[in-house]
Amino acid sequence: CSALTILFLYLTIVFFAKRLVKSSEDGTYTPGKAIAVFGSGAVGALAYCFSDTFWFSAVEGEVYALSSLFTAVVFWLILKWEEHADEEGSDKWLILIAYLMGLSIGTHLLNLLTIPAIVLVYYFRRHDFSWKGVCAAFGVSVAILAVILYGIIPGVPTIAGWFELLFTNVLGCPFNTGLAVYLVLMATALVWAIWESYRVIEIDGQLETPTIVSFVLAMALAGVPFIKESALIGILLIITMLVVLFMKKDVIPARWLNTIAMMVTVVIIGYGSYAAIVIRSNADTPMDQNSPDNVFSLKYY
């Protein structure tokens, strides 16, 4: 993991060096410029490689090596998106970043700190510089962090717990029935939201009522609006989303909703790595801290 981290750091430095050192008209570099570009990448990557902090995190059996790899990869991916942003299908890079973000949740939350940098790269690629725009980009990055940290991560087990209580305590169903129903409903809602938005894109790109309803339902079941595990905040945010989307349905492109729905879906898939914790706990291993063998104990794990 640490070796690959250095590789992606090298590629990142080379990317920025190429922006500073102009190539010839045919895209080639003179020997001196090539040494400057690739040499700067090698020097920067190797300097980080042999630094005390990185070296000793690389040789110990901890989560930081994999976390560093996720950090290096997602930032390199946003640079790849920046290169191909005007091409058709460039959103695939953003979706891959979201998937790796979801996977990184199961490793270490440190990787989420790349979100502000990623949002700024997106902003400077799509818009001209202005201080107002930069502040807005920072605001969007904070909102994305809040959605993941205080929405999706605690929201999924919280909503699963509500379903579990309903099906077990009220309806008298077997244990874990509510969890199974919730997972099926969430997956169905996400697929519906993606399909509806894609269907509209194929027609004229204008939002329709089924598109908005499916999107808001998918976001709700994914835990996005339930900030701090609060049902009241969740309901208010759901109503706000519905009002804004219906009022701005002629302005907001369906492609945005399609991309957001796919990104939330892959984040949930990556977040699913936590299923290993529940499976391991149900095996009654000798080391089983907090015994997270159900959705209620998993929430506080």
Language-model features and meaning:
Residues 17, 29-35, 74-94, 101, ...:
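Membrane-interface transmembrane helices that cradle and orient dolichyl/undecaprenyl
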Residues 44-46, 93-107, 217-226:
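Membrane-interface alpha helices of multi-pass inner-membrane proteins
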Residues 128-139, 171-181, 202-212, 230-233, ...:
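Membrane-interfacial entry segments at the cytosolic side of transmembrane helices
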Residues 1-28, 73-77:
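Transmembrane-helix motifs of polytopic, lipid-linked glycan transferases
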Residues 258-301:
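Aromatic-rich transmembrane-lumenal/periplasmic boundary elements in polytopic membrane proteins
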Residues 110-122, 154-158, 231-238:
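Transmembrane-embedded, aromatic-rich helix segments that form part
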Residues 53-64, 110:
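Short acidic/glycine- and proline-prone juxtamembrane loop motifs at membrane-interface regions
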